[in-house]
């Protein structure tokens, strides 16, 4: 029997029930009632400092500490939510409700990330325009989330496709485009390096303070408009480049490195990705590499996410070295980056990427005595390079760098000159060198690198060892010579001495030094010789920012007849997408590496070609036909929650300082930012890194006052579920699977349509045919039961199994709470106003103290367990005292708000408990002795419970069974042995 069928059987029997029993029908009525009250009264409105959103439920921001909690907003690309999606939303809501009850001004809202590939692909599948399907999906998601009872300030909701939002996304792009990174300037946080308006760079060129690259000796005014644009393009933080990109024919667009899997496939769709040289927009995120690493120390994020970002950015210290390359067109410069400049004496050849510019200067004929196996069977270097470039384009990036793959390469006919030794190094091209990593050129040291060694062996190139093992290591270089490279950063430098260097004519010796000492010495020599310097490099590549899609933000850029880009003035924003029927991208055979992108907007000539006056009279311009990636809107959306009605500012300064500024509350710290951001760890090197980059640019330019967007990050786990396959391996509907008797090994059996079915455990998803929706839960149990079950399943940060059979346990808790307050027969309140006995006082105050700790630590599951203990105790009393049940209701309300609002109202309170004071423990009764009860199944400890020393054995048994319900699979145990208060031993049913 499937979980869905069992859930139906597990429903409380509503026939012949008392008239006022808490059941699914009553819950639905209560929930809809309170959701309407909350909406009508603006219960969850947060109060701004100024503007239209200043009033918040009769409160204002003055004197109230702010707290900003938010979720990673959803992509409205499917047909709605399943029960796994809201885990983070519910957690954020619980925290938000708790902080409101602490007297804080809480901002909690929800928007929709509506642009990008997911929404467009869904629209293509359904045959409708992306805007229509996206807005329908938003409406459905909004309904599902509203029905969940989430405490959003709905005045602050928006979608990234809203024209008013697109305007500010394009405005931010304009500021980034109109900025450059000055490494010598001091940023507002006091560290080195700062984004500055591009006008300040122009001033330096005009005044002569800075030489004009490529035009040394010329005045800025002597350059043409196109020449000036080209120079500035090399400095802008958003710039146009013709460079190797990840081209995905199956999707018809280019992808950022972060959107390509380790297998060289597109993250979405799993299509092959190829390296192509195309003209694209990029963002100079690498300029912020060091700050993006350094500032991780200022924020409260999971260490695993910090590590993922550090590794992705990949800061390394080494040297840039310039080699002269002799070409038919004169001596050219080849810059390489190496982390081991101490091995320059061991360089025996050099390698450039197939996309490297030096390959435009190869000779017409092979040099004399070129070995045949270096030529690859080609008559000339020109033919060889052309063919090799085509072959490289047809490979994925993963294929090119695969350590286990065959090392391919060709001699270019060129030689590079070692700046120290003067040795002529044959220059090869090989596809394992990528143009977008480092400089696209490497010096090869086969004595110290495995890949270089393999390449040298294949092409008969010399191997020079420049490092030997330390004497105390017990190792010897003889173990490697002629067999393998000696790859170590810890050793003694050898074979690295010369009487007269090529670049300076002086002597240089590194022999006898440790590697680190040799690196320092050679770096100093490189700088003194003018052929290099110590530098920092990053694994991180600049962010590829353009897509050949329809459903994205248009760029606020037009091009003149000469191709010069022009930024549109802010008053012309937003630039909206034209409403056209032909919005789908042109896709290709996934293996067609030779295909060329075709942006859908290029087909709309009336939109592309425009007459504009940009200050020098009306002229014809052409719009950029690329669109921004789906990450653009999500880079800054957190700030728009502060006031989406503001038409004058991206974010107004006073509002930013109040909600997100440095030290805006006791926990914000100097980094400032959102107080709590909940979302999946899968966004660690995508959205989270991009948002930090945009935020830092805006910080440098003075538009925001905090150096980080998100102060505290919390990654929720995943809700998992069973899925079922037939004997062909095809997934079958989980709701139609029937559980049969156990097999000979005691394992359950399953059938679908009378045929054997196999059960597996993993994700919940449409393709797995095991989706359970929140709507199912609302109908069968109510939103509060759903919230209570999901929050009580286990620690928020861990993945956990969904089991519909166990949802009824959460409903029974709410039913017991209801019965403690309401007479099920008459509907009358049944609490008393008597004083609490000592036992109840102790339990109540310890529960308040403990639950407060659990809520602060975001452990709602353990808070629920403690509230169950208190409620069970109240159930055992002859009469339930108001003084005990009201604090219980208040503490449960962040998790199950509707039933708590109803009970609070029935107890005579006229105001919503959403803003009631959180209970405070009376310290006189806190800290009383408790014991740890161990729950064992077949002798193995499966749970631990903190209980009162005088707990009733029956109550302990009930708590123990609830704690291990998932492990029992919904079956009654064969035997339970209770030794209160310390041990519960369970023998499960066979």
UniProtKB/Swiss-Prot annotation:
Its EC number is 6.1.1.4. It comes from the Bacteria. It catalyses: tRNA(Leu) + L-leucine + ATP = L-leucyl-tRNA(Leu) + AMP + diphosphate. The gene is leuS. A motif ('HIGH' region) lies at residues 74-85. The keyword Translocase does not apply. This is Leucine--tRNA ligase. GO terms for cellular component: cytosol. GO terms for molecular function: aminoacyl-tRNA deacylase activity; ATP binding; leucine-tRNA ligase activity. Keywords: Aminoacyl-tRNA synthetase, ATP-binding, Cytoplasm, Ligase, Nucleotide-binding, Protein biosynthesis. Gene3D superfamilies: HUPs, Isoleucyl-tRNA Synthetase, Domain 1, Valyl/Leucyl/Isoleucyl-tRNA synthetase, editing domain. A motif ('KMSKS' region) lies at residues 763-767. InterPro entries: aa-tRNA-synth_I_CS, Leu-tRNA-ligase, Leu_tRNA-synth_edit, M/V/L/I-tRNA-synth_anticd-bd, Methionyl/Leucyl_tRNA_Synth, Rossmann-like_a/b/a_fold, tRNAsynth_Ia_anticodon-bd, Val/Leu/Ile-tRNA-synth_edit. GO terms for biological process: leucyl-tRNA aminoacylation. The lineage of its organism: Bacteria, Bacillati, Actinomycetota, Actinomycetes, Bifidobacteriales. Belongs to the class-I aminoacyl-tRNA synthetase family. The keyword Ligase applies. Residues 573-602 are annotated as: Disordered. ATP binds at residue 766. It is found in: Cytoplasm.
């Amino acid at each position: 029997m499937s979980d869905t069928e069992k859930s139906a059987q597990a429903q409380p029997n509503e026939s012949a029930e008392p008239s006022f029993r808490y059941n699914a029908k009553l819950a639905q009525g209560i929930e809809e009632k309170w959701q309407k009250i909350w909406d009508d009264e603006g219960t969850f409105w947060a109060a701004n400092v100024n503007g239209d959103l200043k009033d918040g439920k009769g409160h204002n921001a003055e004197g109230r500490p702010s707290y900003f909690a938010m979720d990673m907003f959803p992509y409205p690309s499917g047909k709605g939510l399943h029960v796994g999606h809201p885990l983070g939303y519910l957690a954020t809501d619980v925290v938000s409700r708790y902080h409101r009850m602490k007297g804080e001004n809480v901002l909690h809202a929800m928007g929709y990330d509506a642009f990008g590939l997911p929404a467009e692909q869904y629209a293509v599948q359904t045959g409708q325009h992306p805007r229509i399907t996206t807005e329908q999906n938003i409406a459905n998601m909004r309904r599902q989330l509203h029905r969940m009872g989430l405490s959003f300030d709905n005045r602050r909701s928006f979608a990234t496709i809203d024209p008013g939002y697109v305007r500010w996304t394009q405005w931010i792009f304009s500021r980034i485009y109109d900025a450059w990174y000055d490494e010598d300037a001091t940023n507002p946080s006091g560290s080195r390096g700062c984004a500055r308006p591009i006008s300040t760079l122009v001033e330096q060129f005009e005044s002569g303070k800075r030489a004009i690259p490529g035009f040394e000796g010329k005045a800025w005014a002597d350059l043409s408009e196109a020449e000036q644009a080209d120079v500035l393009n090399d400095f802008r933080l958003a710039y146009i480049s013709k460079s190797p990109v990840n081209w995905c024919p199956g999707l018809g667009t280019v992808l950022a490195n972060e959107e390509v899997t380790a297998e060289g496939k597109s993250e979405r769709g799993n299509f092959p990705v190829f390296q192509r040289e195309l003209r694209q927009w990029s963002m100079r995120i690498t300029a912020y590499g060091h700050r993006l690493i350094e500032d991780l120390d200022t924020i409260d994020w999971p260490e695993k996410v910090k590590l993922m970002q550090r590794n992705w950015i990949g800061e390394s210290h080494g040297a840039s070295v310039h080699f002269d390359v002799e070409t038919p067109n004169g001596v050219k410069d080849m810059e390489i980056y190496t982390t081991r400049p101490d091995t320059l004496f061991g360089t025996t050849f050099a390698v450039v990427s197939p996309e490297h510019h030096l390959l435009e200067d190869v000779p017409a004929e092979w040099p004399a005595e070129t070995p045949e196996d270096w030529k690859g069977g080609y008559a000339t270097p020109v033919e060889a390079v052309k063919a090799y470039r085509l072959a490289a384009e047809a490979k994925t990036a993963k294929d090119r760098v695969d350590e286990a793959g065959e090392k391919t390469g060709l001699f270019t006919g060129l030689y590079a000159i070692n700046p120290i030794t003067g040795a002529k190094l044959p220059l090869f091209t090989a596809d394992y060198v990528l143009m977008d990593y480092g400089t696209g050129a490497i010096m090869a040291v086969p004595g110290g690198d495995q890949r270089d060694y393999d390449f040298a062996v294949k092409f008969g190139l010399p191997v020079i060892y420049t490092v030997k093992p330390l004497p105390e290591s017990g190792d010897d270089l003889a173990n490697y010579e002629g067999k393998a490279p000696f790859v170590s950063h810890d050793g003694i430098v050898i074979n690295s001495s010369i009487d007269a260097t090529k670049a300076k004519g002086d002597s240089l010796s590194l022999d006898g030094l440790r590697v680190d000492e040799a690196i320092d010495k050679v770096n100093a020599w490189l700088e003194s010789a003018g052929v290099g310097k110590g530098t920092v490099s990053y694994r991180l590549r600049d962010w590829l920012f353009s897509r050949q899609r329809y459903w994205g933000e248009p760029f606020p850029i037009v091009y003149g007849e000469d191709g010069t880009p022009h930024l549109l003035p802010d008053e012309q924003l937003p630039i909206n997408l034209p409403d056209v029927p032909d919005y789908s991208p042109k896709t290709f055979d996934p293996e067609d590496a030779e295909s060329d992108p075709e942006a859908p907007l290029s087909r709309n000539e009336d939109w592309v070609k425009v007459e504009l006056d940009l200050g020098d009279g009306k002229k014809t311009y052409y719009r950029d036909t690329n669109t921004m990636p789906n990450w653009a809107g999500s880079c800054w959306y957190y700030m728009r929650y502060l006031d989406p009605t503001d038409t004058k500012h991206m974010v107004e300064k006073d509002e930013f300082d109040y909600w997100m500024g440095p030290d805006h509350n006791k926990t914000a710290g100097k980094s400032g930012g959102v107080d709590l951001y909940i979302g999946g760890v899968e966004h660690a090197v995508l959205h989270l890194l991009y948002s930090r980059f945009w935020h830092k640019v805006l910080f440098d330019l003075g538009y925001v006052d905090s150096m980080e967007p998100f102060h505290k990050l919390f990654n929720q786990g995943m809700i998992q579920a069973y899925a079922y396959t037939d004997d062909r391996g095809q997934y079958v509907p989980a709701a139609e699977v029937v559980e049969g008797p156990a097999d000979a090994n005691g394992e359950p059996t399953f059938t679908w349509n009378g045929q054997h079915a196999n059960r597996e455990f993993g994700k919940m998803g449409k393709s797995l045919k095991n989706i359970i929706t929140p709507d199912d839960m609302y109908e069968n149990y109510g939103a509060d039961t759903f919230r209570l079950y999901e929050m009580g399943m286990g620690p928020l940060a861990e993945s956990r199994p969904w089991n519909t059979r166990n949802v009824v346990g959460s409903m029974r808790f709410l039913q017991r709470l209801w019965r403690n307050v309401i007479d099920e027969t008459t509907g009358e309140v049944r609490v008393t106003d008597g004083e609490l006995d000592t036992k109840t006082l102790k339990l109540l105050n310890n529960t308040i103290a403990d639950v407060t700790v659990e809520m602060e630590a975001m452990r709602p599951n353990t808070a629920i367990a403690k509230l169950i203990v208190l409620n069970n105790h109240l159930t055992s009393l002859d009469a339930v005292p108001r003084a005990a049940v009201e604090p219980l209701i208040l503490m449960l309300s962040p998790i199950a708000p509707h039933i708590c609002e109803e009970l609070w109202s029935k107890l005579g309170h006229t105001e919503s408990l959403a803003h009631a004071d959180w209970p405070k423990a009376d310290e006189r009764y806190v800290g009383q002795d408790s014991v740890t009860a161990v729950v064992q199944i077949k002798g193995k400890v499966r749970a631990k419970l903190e209980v009162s020393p005088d707990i009733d054995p029956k109550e302990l048994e009930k708590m123990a069974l609830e704690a291990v319900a998932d492990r029992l699979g919904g079956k009654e145990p064969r035997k339970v042995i209770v030794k209160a208060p310390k041990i519960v031993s369970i023998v499960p049913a066979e």
